[in-house]
Amino acid sequence: AEYLHPDDFISGFETFLAVSKNENLKGPAVILSGILPHPEILRLLDRQGVRVVDDDLLNCNRRMPMSRGLAQGPYEILVENYFAMPPCPTRGSPIQERIDFMMDKVHKNDVQGVIFCGIKFCEPEWFDVPQMVAAAKDAGLKTLLLDLEVNQPLSGQLATRVEAFVEMIS
């Protein structure tokens, strides 16, 4: 929705709602964390019956302020919104805040697994992954790490890894 004209987004969203209204919601639930993966990966998850019930993606939920402020001026609003954003490694958030934020999503959504998507050479996004994976595993969750390249299409190897992960959480 970020780059679409509102008319295009609204019609696409209405189509999505109409198509998915009567869908069976029994597939395994996952959270995506990191960088939004290529659409082919998302389509593969959809074909496998996976439900992405929440996200901790840099360009999705991590950009949404967690609380609405009371500031009036444009600069105050900008500052308030920046500091109201969810924890993010690109802003130097403490790792425990990120873990708590993710685990809160896990508990609210009855999640079976977490998929961590990172782009090669995007170090800030990878800084917290070892501790976040450990926290997810301690909670009994399965994890999948996808080390991707910008605009990397779905390869056979990547598809096999995703399919194996889906089998583990199903």
Labelled PLM ranges:
Residues 1-67:
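A charged, amphipathic alpha-helical module
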Residues 31-39, 120-127, 153:
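Gly/Ser/Thr-rich loops at beta-strand to alpha-helix junctions
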Residues 47-97:
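Flexible internal linker/loop segments at domain or repeat junctions
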Residues 93-110, 127-128:
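A short, acidic, amphipathic alpha-helical segment used as a generic capping/interface helix at domain edges
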Residues 112-120:
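Acidic beta-strand-to-loop metal/phosphate-binding motif
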Residues 130-170:
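Peripheral docking tails and interdomain loops at the edges
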